Amino acid sequence: MATHKPLGFKLRLASAGKSNRNPPAWVMVKTDRKVTYNTKRRNWRRVKLKLG
C-alpha cells in the first residue's frame, strides 16, 4: 500500500481499525453479559475491506 493516501481513504481505514475490537468491559456489565463479543470482528488475513 502506498505511503501517500488520500484523506478520505485514510479516514475509512482508521474507522475500520477502530471498529475491529472487542466491546469494552463496561458494556458487559451494563447488559448483564448479554453482549460478550463483537459479531462484526474482522481478521486482516481472512476478510479484506472493500475500500479500493
From Swiss-Prot:
PROSITE patterns: RIBOSOMAL_L39E. Keywords: Ribonucleoprotein, Ribosomal protein. The keyword Ribosomal protein applies. Belongs to the eukaryotic ribosomal protein eL39 family. This is Large ribosomal subunit protein eL39. One of its GO terms (cellular component) is cytosolic large ribosomal subunit. It holds the Pfam family Ribosomal_L39. GO terms for biological process: translation. The keyword Ribonucleoprotein applies. It comes from Caldivirga maquilingensis (strain ATCC 700844 / DSM 13496 / JCM 10307 / IC-167). One of its GO terms (molecular function) is structural constituent of ribosome.
